[in-house]
């Protein structure tokens, strides 16, 4: 049977496509990450030791948890991505515990290292 309204193909993207609140801070952070992915990432090359890559991880962390928490999670992920750091599959946690406060950003280091054990 002919369908006059064909379904649109789902667009492939490398970034998080789930639901998230579109606040000004998140939009600014995601815009900066996307700018990096489009411009600078091509010059640096695919050298990330993790899956998803550090920019994809930071994009998803900001989308899910906001600019402050997501940026700290991404920062610590980039620190761990060095030659003597971690590697492998490390997803963004779906929720943060109550012990993670905005005034203790060093606590976000512990979030990501739990996934590698």
Curated annotation (Swiss-Prot):
Pfam families in the record: YidD (PF01809)
Membrane topology listed for this record: Peripheral membrane protein
Swiss-Prot/TrEMBL keywords: Cell inner membrane, Cell membrane, Membrane
GO cellular component: plasma membrane
Protein localization: Cell inner membrane
InterPro entries: Membr_insert_effic_factor_YidD
Lineage top rank: taxon: Bacteria
Keyword Membrane set for record: yes
NCBIfam families: membrane protein insertion efficiency factor YidD
Purpose: Could be involved in insertion of integral membrane proteins into the membrane.
Entry similarity comment: Belongs to the UPF0161 family.
Record protein name field: Putative membrane protein insertion efficiency factor
Taxonomic placement: Bacteria, Pseudomonadati, Pseudomonadota, Alphaproteobacteria, Hyphomicrobiales
């Amino acid at each position: 049977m002919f369908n006059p309204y064909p379904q649109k193909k789902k667009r492939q993207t490398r970034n998080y496509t789930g639901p998230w609140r579109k606040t000004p801070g998140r939009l600014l952070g995601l815009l900066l990450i996307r700018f990096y992915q489009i411009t600078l990432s091509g010059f640096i090359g695919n050298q990330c030791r993790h899956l998803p890559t550090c920019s994809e991880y930071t994009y998803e962390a900001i989308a899910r948890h906001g600019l402050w928490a997501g940026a700290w999670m991404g920062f610590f992920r980039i620190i761990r991505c060095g030659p003597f750091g971690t590697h492998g599959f490390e997803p963004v946690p779906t929720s943060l515990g109550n012990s993670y406060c905005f005034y203790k950003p060093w606590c976000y280091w512990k979030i990501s290292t739990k996934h590698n054990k």
